[in-house]
Every structure is written in structure tokens, then in C-alpha cells.
């Protein structure tokens, strides 16, 4: 949702992004009825951080527990290398947000580092360097703590004697991106650090680039549990919060996920678990373990189905060795903005359209990039708060075809990406005249924007920051 509200923003001091040659910008959302911020979840700009943080259902759940969200674009420091200034920049960012928002507790609020894919390694390292302040850790479609397979593909940070004992951490891996070598380091970490609290979810029926509503609900429950189990009943908001350290033996164990598994050990309290504890993960309690098992049950023993995209009446090619498996061309209508794509079911090779699938239609949704959905097959280019000056990302669009499955067929997904020609360097140059807005009196709910193009083209707007929404002009 590119129109989602972010009330405040600050620049990240001391850091220059190679994507913009400028300071990254951090955006803060706090629930509108929040009297006290009890935690802040921080994610930087890779892909699905933005998708999750602007998910309406997820925001509703965060409002219930008083969790704020910070999204930083461009992302920086995939390692959390304190020698490169990340720690100082992080602390200054929260000081600045406390000053401009009026929520002074942001200076000391517990943090949940969150990252996807190439940014999914830093959350563990953040926790190792900030154990007293880390409420929980989430590595989404990512990797294990201290892994040798980092999301960014290079060496990991060396922890020395640091640990994340007593801090709940969650690793999530999609079923359709499954790789045993990513899971094994998480199991090994539990053996190496028996006081650690490492949870795991196989995001069944999902891939690497997407985040379903049901997964957002799972994350929300994990965060709610972290607050329930770790925050003291009362504390001084103007001082660091003394978080409770968890004892893993007070939690539950559940067997790790296996592809095509027919029998599973029953989830149970830590000391009563009858399966192999070396092949199991930790969970807060019965509710969290049961939700994990239910996710696995929902997709078990169902028939697979496959998705593709049609553009100009042709099924787009599927490239199994590519990171994003389907690529489109930007083929806009005469306005230069509107384009069309259709999601279809295909055979297992993604070469022909198939009739073997669920009875309902798949849908296309935005993952990231300057795009807005008009209807099931129509989309339009719309720039947003990421800005116009990111040479890597401003022109990148990534979309998702998905279907949640039914009693017979599994949930399935397929991603697609392409670039738009940005910036345009051909044709007549245009100028936009955007008259300033005068003082607005209290009680006024809407203001008309009167920008015009000297070429007579329509002008579009987006909210960079602040509690406002755009409705045409």
C-alpha cells in the first residue's frame, strides 16, 4: 500500500548510501491512538520489510500492542558492523525521532530488528551487540544466527563471547525457497547455545519474495508474546527497560518442518517433548507451537498448482535459474504509465496454461516499487516516499501472483519483476508549477493541491511524510 501513513521522518546521520549518494531516510509510524510506545520494529529497504510494515492487518495488530515501526530507505549495513558507524547512527536516529514526535520513550524503547533476504542477517548481529535492548529478533526468508550462509553472500560478523541467550528469535524460510543448508545452522546454534530461544517457521505454500496475511498474523502473535513474556509490569519510560531474560525450558518444543513429512512428533512443553530435541525448535508456549503446527497442517497432502503471467496474450517465460523467475517488459498505454498483466495457472514447467487448479482466480499484488494496482489486470506507475533519486530502486517494480489454495490444492505464488525507463531523457522537457499552500486553520480536513504541468499532462502527488492521505488533488 504505497499510500500508507508514516507520520515522521529523519535522515540517518553519518551514513551515505551508494544507491542515492545521500543519507538514508528513516520513516516512523506510531499507532494513532498510542499513548506510550512499548516497542519499535526496525526494517530497512530490501523488499518485504515495506510490504509487511504497510500491511493493514499487521498494523492493526501492532496498534493493539503499542508497537511502532521504522522503515529506512535505502537500506544500509547488511552485517550491522559497529565499526562502520551503524550503532552510533541508530542511536542518533532514535534520539531524533523522540525529539520530533514527542514520544520521548523512543530513546530507550525495546527494539525488534527485522530483515528480509539480503538484510536478514543483521537482526541477529544487532541483538548480539544490543542484548539488553533487543526485545526479539526476526529473520524473514533469511538465515540463522551466526550462519555461514549470509543473505548478502559474504562473511558474517564474528561474535566473540557475545550471545543472544534469553532473547526470542524467529527464523522464517519459505517452502518454495527451501534449502536444508539454511536450516541446519539454526539447529546447530541451538546445540551450541542451549540457553538460546530460537523459533522457526516454514512459510508453507509461500516463496522468497512474498508475505501473506496469515504470515503477518503469525509474526504479530510472536511479537505480542515477546512483549507479554519480556516487558516488566511497570517501568520508567525515561530509562532503559530491564527486559526479562527467557529460560528456554519454560517454553515448548516442536519438530522442525520436513518436506512431504507423513508423521511428526507432537509439540509439547520443553521437558515433556518426546521427539528428538536436536531436531526441534523452541516456542514461547502452546499457542505459538500450535499455530506453527496448524500452518504445516494446512498445506499437507494437497496437490500442487503453479502460476504464471500473461502479457499481451502471451505467457511470459519462466527462468528457473534466475533470482526472480519471471521478467516482464514495460508496455504502457498511451499515457506512458498504465500497463496490463494477468495471473494464470500453468503446468509444472510453467510453459502452458493449465486447467488443473483451484476453482477461484489468482490475484496480483504489489511487492515493492513505484506501482499501484487499479484492478485485477491493470496497474499504473506511481512514485512514492522512496523518492525519485535511487538509481538502483526508483525504476524497479516487483509484483506477486498468488493463490491461497483450497481443500485440494496448495497455496502457491509466483513473482515477476521489470524496470521502467527512468529517468526519461528523450522528448520535450516539462516543468511543474506547484503553488505553495498557505496557513491551514485548525479543523480544516482537506486542502486542494494545484500543481500543473506546462505540457498539459496530469500531475500526481504522494505524501512523503506526515499524517495525510492523497485523494486525487
Label every model-predicted segment:
Residues 80-106, 111-113, 125:
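Alpha/beta-hydrolase active-site loop
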Residues 40-41, 46-95:
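Active-site machinery of serine-nucleophile hydrolases
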Residues 304-473:
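Solvent-exposed beta-strand/loop surfaces, strongest in extracytoplasmic domains of secreted
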Residues 196, 204-338:
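Alpha/beta-hydrolase-fold serine-hydrolase catalytic core, especially in secreted/extracellular enzymes
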Residues 135-220:
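The feature captures the conserved acid-bearing segment of alpha/beta-hydrolase catalytic domains
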Amino acid at each position: 500500500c504505497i499510500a500508507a501513513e508514516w507520520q515522521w521522518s529523519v535522515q540517518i546521520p553519518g551514513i551515505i548510501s551508494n544507491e542515492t549518494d545521500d543519507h538514508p531516510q528513516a520513516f516512523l509510524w506510531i499507532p494513532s491512538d498510542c499513548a506510550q510506545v512499548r516497542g519499535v520494529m526496525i526494517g530497512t529497504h530490501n523488499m518485504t520489510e515495506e510490504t509487511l510494515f504497510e500491511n493493514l492487518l499487521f498494523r492493526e495488530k501492532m496498534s493493539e500492542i503499542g508497537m511502532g515501526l521504522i522503515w529506512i530507505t535505502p537500506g544500509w549495513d547488511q552485517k550491522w558492523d559497529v565499526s562502520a558507524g551503524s550503532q552510533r547512527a541508530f542511536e542518533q536516529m532514535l534520539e531524533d525521532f523522540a525529539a520530533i514526535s514527542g514520544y520521548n520513550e523512543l530513546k530507550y524503547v525495546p527494539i525488534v530488528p527485522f530483515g528480509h533476504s539480503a538484510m536478514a542477517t543483521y537482526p541477529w548481529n544487532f541483538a548480539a551487540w544490543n542484548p539488553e535492548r533487543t526485545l526479539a529478533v526476526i529473520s524473514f526468508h533469511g538465515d540463522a544466527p551466526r550462519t555461514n550462509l549470509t543473505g548478502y553472500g559474504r562473511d558474517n560478523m564474528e561474535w566473540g563471547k557475545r550471545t543472544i541467550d534469553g532473547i526470542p528469535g524467529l527464523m522464517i524460510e519459505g517452502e518454495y525457497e527451501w534449502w536444508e543448508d539454511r536450516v541446519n545452522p539454526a539447529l546447530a546454534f541451538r546445540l551450541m547455545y542451549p540457553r538460546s530461544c530460537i523459533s522457526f517457521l516454514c512459510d508453507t505454500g509461500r516463496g522468497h519474495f512474498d508475505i501473506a496475511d496469515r504470515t503477518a498474523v503469525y509474526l504479530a502473535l510472536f511479537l505480542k508474546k515477546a512483549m507479554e513474556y519480556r516487558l516488566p509490569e511497570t517501568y520508567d519510560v525515561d530509562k532503559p527497560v530491564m527486559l526479562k531474560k527467557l529460560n528456554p525450558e519454560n517454553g515448548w518444543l516442536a519438530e522442525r518442518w520436513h518436506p512431504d513429512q507423513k508423521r511428526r512428533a507432537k509439540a509439547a512443553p520443553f521437558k515433556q517433548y518426546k521427539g528428538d530435541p536436536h531436531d526441534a525448535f523452541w516456542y514461547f508456549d502452546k499457542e505459538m507451537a500450535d499455530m506453527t503446527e496448524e500452518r504445516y497442517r494446512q498445506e499437507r497432502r494437497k496437490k500442487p498448482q503453479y502460476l504464471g503471467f500473461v502479457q499481451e496474450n502471451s505467457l511470459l517465460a519462466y527462468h528457473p535459474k534466475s533470482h526472480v523467475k519471471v521478467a516482464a517488459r514495460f508496455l504502457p498505454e498511451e499515457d506512458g504509465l498504465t500497463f496490463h498483466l494477468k495471473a494464470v495457472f500453468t503446468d509444472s514447467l510453467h510453459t502452458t496454461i493449465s486447467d488443473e487448479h483451484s476453482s477461484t482466480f489468482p490475484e496480483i499484488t504489489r511487492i515493492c516499487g513505484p506501482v499501484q494496482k487499479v484492478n485485477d489486470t491493470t496497474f499504473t506507475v506511481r512514485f512514492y516516499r522512496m523518492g525519485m533519486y535511487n538509481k538502483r530502486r526508483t525504476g524497479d517494480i516487483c509484483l506477486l501472483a498468488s493463490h491461497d489454495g483450497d481443500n485440494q490444492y496448495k497455496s502457491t505464488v509466483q513473482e515477476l519483476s521489470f524496470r521502467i525507463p527512468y529517468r526519461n531523457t528523450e522528448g520535450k522537457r516539462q516543468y511543474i508549477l506547484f503553488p505553495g499552500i498557505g496557513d491551514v486553520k485548525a479543523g480544516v480536513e482537506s486542502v486542494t493541491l494545484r500543481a500543473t504541468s506546462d505540457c498539459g499532462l496530469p500531475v500526481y502527488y504522494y505524501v512523503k511524510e506526515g499524517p495525510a492521505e492523497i485523494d486525487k488533488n
